[in-house]
């Protein structure tokens, strides 16, 4: 699942009723909002282009989710990996749920920016930094486009300062063992895939080519098919 940076966009004066368009009058603040939105949509787009199934997860819904056996469960959906886009803050209740998820074996991959703003009475920045194995705030590095590999903190908490998609895919591969894998011989990213497990015995896979032309592709399934 990919966490929505809802409250981070709010604090940068993004209007949630109009696609988080900026409603303030500070150019620096406007640029920060633009950067947060671009990075969030960028992660989303790259996950789609690399055929990684995911759902968007609102922090308020996360607060109500059930966390057991290293999975976040919401209705019929469950997630073993939670990806955090760059965020400047997070609600305490959502952070408590993330901590529980990590304690139970879940995987959390944060990108570029960890929360540093306080939107509630409780200060949690240092606890978040400790969880991801960092000794200082990431706020200045993000706005300066810091580059680097990744840091593994407590349990399965990862922080990728550069937000490099290849590093994100590498960490995902370490923990997310795909039952169905699709790739083209040419490496073209014009294909979109959607996988839905309808029962323990049945999985539906939809593949669509968004461009013209023929391509050779391979689909691998990790279990016997009839």
PLM feature segments, named:
Residues 1-226:
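Carbohydrate-binding surfaces of carbohydrate-active enzymes
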């Amino acid at each position: 699942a990919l966490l929505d940076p809802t409250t981070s966009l709010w604090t940068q004066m993004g209007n949630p009723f109009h696609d988080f368009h900026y409603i303030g009058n500070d150019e620096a603040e406007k640029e920060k909002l633009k950067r947060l939105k671009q990075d969030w949509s960028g992660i989303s787009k790259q996950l789609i282009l690399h055929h990684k199934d995911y759902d968007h997860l609102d922090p308020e819904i996360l607060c109500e989710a059930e966390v057991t056996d290293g999975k976040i469960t919401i209705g019929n959906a469950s997630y073993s990996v939670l990806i955090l886009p760059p965020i400047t803050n997070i609600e305490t209740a959502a952070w408590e749920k993330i901590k529980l998820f990590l304690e139970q074996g879940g995987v959390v991959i944060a990108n570029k920016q960890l929360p540093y703003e306080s939107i509630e009475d409780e200060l949690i920045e240092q606890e978040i930094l400790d969880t991801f194995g960092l000794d200082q705030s990431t706020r200045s590095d993000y706005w300066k486009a810091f580059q680097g590999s990744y840091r593994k903190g407590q349990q399965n908490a990862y922080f990728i300062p550069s937000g490099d998609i290849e590093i994100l895919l590498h960490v995902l591969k370490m923990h997310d063992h795909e039952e169905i894998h699709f790739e083209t011989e040419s490496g073209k990213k014009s294909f979109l895939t959607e996988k839905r497990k309808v029962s323990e015995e049945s999985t539906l896979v939809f593949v669509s080519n968004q461009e013209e032309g023929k391509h050779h592709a391979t689909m691998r399934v990790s279990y016997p098919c009839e």
